[in-house]
Amino acid sequence: RTARASYDDLANILYTSGTTGEPKGVMLHHSCYLEQFHTHDERLTTMTDKDVSMNFLPLTHVFEKAWSYLCIHKGVQICINLRPADIQTTIKEIRPTLMCSVPRFWEKVYAGVQEKISETTGLKKALMLDAIKVGRIHNLDYLRQGKTPPVMNQLKYKFYEKTIYSLLKKTIGIE
């Protein structure tokens, strides 16, 4: 049976919720997922079978389904969050090393961080703001692009990893 499998075979059908009209089914073929595996194999080079991922979205959501397939492809342990309303507690229980979610979730995390920063002053506030800037450059401008960050950025990132980032990760539960 495996010998007859094709990239063009149907992998699954995902349906829209119908909130803006009639629900629609989208036929997704294995080639869609395999192409994503190839791209992520090149870009997410640190993802290994030692990682733990936590599903936050329903598996009917294409983003979560594709992420779950990628985790299976990489041998990552997948934990399913059964209590969406208790996401912060669940994250602290699971302590995922990887997680994908829609931007709104991370916007809420970011807003919480910004609120904490606004309550601080002086050197502590300056260090927190610089840590965000360094992290953004390190991860978005370099690692996400498959590039090596400059040495100075790497040094600053390591410093913040041992101070601010580790504290933040521990607070969120993603250490």
Q: Which residues does each predicted region cover?
A:
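Short aromatic/basic micro-patch
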Residues: 4, 27, 100
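Conserved AMP-binding A3 loop
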Residues: 11-37
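Conserved pre-ATP/AMP-binding loop-to-beta segment of ANL
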Residues: 1-15, 22, 46-52
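Short, intrinsically disordered, charge-balanced linker/junction segments flanking boundaries
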Residues: 173-175
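Conserved AMP-binding/adenylation subdomain of ANL enzymes
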Residues: 34-52, 59-166, 171
